[in-house]
């Protein structure tokens, strides 16, 4: 089994990444804790996934200033829970960019007046879109979870539960063919055996914390089913319930061709096509 530790040495201000790569082939991921990733593509596009940032206890303080994220091209949200939709509506309005997520979530955001239809378009699992150019394909796939949207009504001050659509994962195929599978929140399910040969993900972003998502043992089994070149564990340690650890995931995974990169919040990792 291959493992590397990737992240940001906050005290020294040093970023640890893979060896230098030609800019046109480089893919850079910034992890902001939980399931939040900023993806810089080889063609210069910026994709933000599940931006739970300002209220995230694991996001470093310097990144809680949303302006530091820079210009974004699109936001992807895997489901309606607050630790995934997070700051997405704020960023969408601030930068005038679209949020793509479950169709039911888009409907709710529009119905409640949080976003306009232009900023919350609809799609569903199985669909593939090209919202930021023909060379980047984004496909929604199944996730085994729930997706309620919790809303505090500004008039009544009461907490309301609204439709959030079905939870999803995202297959993100970049300009150079490098493919990322962000699983969102999910349990283990049998159709993961189809995703590997169908989409051939190079990089798997996989939840391991347990309780609400896969625990390390199930996450290891999912990794064996998908067989990516690389895997980054996520969605752990943010709350006491998410007790699974990267060490447990690595132990459960055992000997494998998948290279596991354990990141720290605020850290970056750089990839090329394997």
Segments predicted by a language model, with ranges:
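Active-site-proximal loop/helix segments of hydrolase catalytic cores
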Residues: 151-152, 156-225
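Active-site neighborhood of phospho(di)ester-bond hydrolases with catalytic His/Asp-centered motifs
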Residues: 48-50, 72-80, 100-103, 180-186, ...
